[in-house]
Amino acid sequence: MICEELKSRKNFVEEDFIELRDSVEGLISVIEKYKDMRKDSDGYIRELKKFLEEVNLVLEEKNLTKKELTNLHSLSESYFDSRIDNSIYSYYVYDKNNLEKTHQANDEIGIAKKRFGKILYKITEKVMYHMI
């Protein structure tokens, strides 16, 4: 039922998931750009690439299962929970020898995280609306 309701909304997959894919790719790109400034960056990159594979699969199949839809909500919580040490919300870099580079990097990372969070929230908001 949820899938049918969401499918009936014009271009749910095409618009929102393309934007989600682009935001994940942008976040991966900016983390890779500054990964030398944080030792555990590769773990974040791996997790985001796994997520990107799932997003691409949804785009390729143009189909969302009920499980995928309900998992989006918990995914958004885990990515942006400030109490979780390895959440994307807590990701930042630091170079004690170059504070200007640190500020520039964290500004770029912050913009990419905000874009990713905004579209993920938009999608989960639609999912939660249809689950009520």
At which residue positions do the language-model features occur?
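Amphipathic alpha-helical binding modules
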Residues: S74-I132
